[in-house]
């Protein structure tokens, strides 16, 4: 199994984020943010099957990953971020997804 230091991969990591993390939301995404003990900011992406078929869900995942890649240099280090995609996020363009996540990151005080 590949080791991804900048990804949340274990079920227990997600459960900790849901239980202890602070929750922020908008029309397209819900994010859970919590501090971790590592020097990197890690990303986890989830969504319900209600969002749509695998093609739609994977497109939203790609949008979130790309937006996170662009914003990562501005984010505080040592945080776990879980992004939950909502059904309306399937119609987003890349710039819209990035703007939405940037607003949420600002509200969560992740942007330095």
Segments and roles (model prediction):
Residues 1-112:
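Positively charged, solvent-exposed patches that mediate nucleic-acid binding
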């Amino acid at each position: 199994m590949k080791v991804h230091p900048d990804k949340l991969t274990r079920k227990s990591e997600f459960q900790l984020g849901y239980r202890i993390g602070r929750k922020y939301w908008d029309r397209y995404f819900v994010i859970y943010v919590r501090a971790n003990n590592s020097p990197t900011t890690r990303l986890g992406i989830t969504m319900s099957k209600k969002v749509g078929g695998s093609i739609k869900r994977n497109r939203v995942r790609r949008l979130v990953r790309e937006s996170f890649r662009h914003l990562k240099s501005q984010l505080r280090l040592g945080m776990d971020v879980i992004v939950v995609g909502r059904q309306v996020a399937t119609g987003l363009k890349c710039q819209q997804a990035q703007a939405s996540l940037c607003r949420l990151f600002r509200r969560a005080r992740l942007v330095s």
